[in-house]
Curated annotation (Swiss-Prot):
Its cofactor is Mg(2+). Monomer. It comes from the Eukaryota. It comes from Mus musculus (Mouse). InterPro entries: Cyt_trans-like, Euk_NMN_adenylyltrnsfrase, NMNAT_euk, Rossmann-like_a/b/a_fold. Expressed predominantly in the brain and nervous system. Degraded in response to injured neurite. Degradation is caused by polyubiquitination by MYCBP2 after recognition by FBXO45. Palmitoylated; palmitoylation is required for membrane association. It catalyses: beta-nicotinamide D-ribonucleotide + ATP + H(+) = diphosphate + NAD(+); nicotinate beta-D-ribonucleotide + ATP + H(+) = deamido-NAD(+) + diphosphate. Gene3D superfamilies: HUPs. ATP binds at H24, T271, K272, S273, R274. This is Nicotinamide/nicotinic acid mononucleotide adenylyltransferase 2.
Length: 307
């Protein structure tokens, strides 16, 4: 497959990130490597979206701290970004609404085709009037040819950085003006862009808990967007999926990363990290990056059992 015929993917991870661990970052890296090896996908970006403060989880530190820790954790990555949108809303947002927000935002700022899992490739280009004999539209009439794949990916990458990139320390993070003029308007007919939910097997397993998830949301998350699962602790993902009628229904939309099931980062968790911090356990350096540890110590986070 050529670059233009492969599905271009943005991986979106929602969660507490309380704190963000090396395991979270490795989850992105492992998912990207796996998708690339299939030959069907090109991962062009990753988004870390920390949950709103009103989520109500015991021991959840302020989103201000979590956003800064997340940014410190990805500061050396050239493709993973932190997005504060979820934290800045008036109240907690569902995973479904976060996915829909990013899909709609990327439609507006890139002009790319953003499709659902089952959308055929003839999907109309969002944001362009559909008329017979429609020609590519440019603000600069001197542009002689349609944009190349490289130009398109550059535009998407630029937009993704503007949307997601936040830098501590600031009182309030700045992200993209959704009404901003991003320059040349092009019809990106060649590129199909999809946002996939990235998660661990623990989140996948939570879909099987009766009443925990809204079934309509599950239909959208799994049926429309799709999921990339990075198993933890050698979890049996086939067994998990067989326990949910919706997961069984959309099994083909769930991609399980099958690499090293004994990957050392697969046992790392935020809970283990907090416990290590509370007990002064030196193994915390195996769980968290040094900039995150330094920030935690400086801010005196997670120093007692309540979080």
């Amino acid at each position: 497959m050529t670059e233009t015929t492969k599905t271009h993917v943005i991986l979106l991870a929602c969660g507490s990130f309380n704190p963000i661990t090396k395991g979270h970052i490795q989850m992105f890296e492992r998912a990207r490597d796996y998708l690339h090896k299939t030959g069907r996908f090109i991962v062009i970006g990753g988004i870390v979206s920390p949950v709103h403060d009103s989520y109500g989880k015991q021991g959840l530190v302020s989103s201000r701290h979590r956003l800064i820790m997340c940014q410190l954790a990805v500061q050396n990555s050239d493709w993973i970004r932190v997005d504060p949108w979820e934290c800045y809303q008036d109240t907690w947002q569902t995973t479904c609404s976060v996915l829909e927000h990013h899909r709609d935002l990327m439609k507006r700022v890139t002009g790319c085709i953003l499709s659902n899992v089952n959308t055929p490739s003839m999907t109309p280009v969002i944001g362009q009037p559909q008329h017979e004999n429609t020609q590519p539209i440019y603000q600069n009439s001197n542009v002689p040819t349609k944009p190349t794949a490289a130009k398109i990916l550059g535009k998407v990458g630029e937009s993704l950085s503007r949307i997601c990139c936040v830098r501590p320390p600031v009182e309030r993070f700045t992200f993209v003006d959704e009404n901003a003029n991003l320059g040349t308007v092009m019809r990106y007919e060649e590129i199909e862009l999809r946002i996939l939910l990235l998660c661990g097997s623990d989140l996948l397993e939570s879909f099987c808990i009766p009443g925990l998830w809204n079934e309509a949301d599950m239909e959208v998350i799994v049926g429309d967007f799709g999921i990339v699962v990075v198993p933890r602790d050698a979890a049996d993902t086939d067994r998990i999926m067989n326990h949910s009628s919706i997961l069984r229904k959309y099994k083909n939309n769930i991609m399980v990363v099958k690499d090293d099931i004994n990957h050392p980062m697969s046992v790392v968790s935020s809970t283990k990290s907090r416990l290590a911090l509370q007990h002064g356990d030196g193994h915390v350096v195996d769980y968290l990056s040094q900039p995150v540890i330094d920030y935690i110590l400086k801010s005196q986070l997670y120093i007692n059992a309540s979080g």
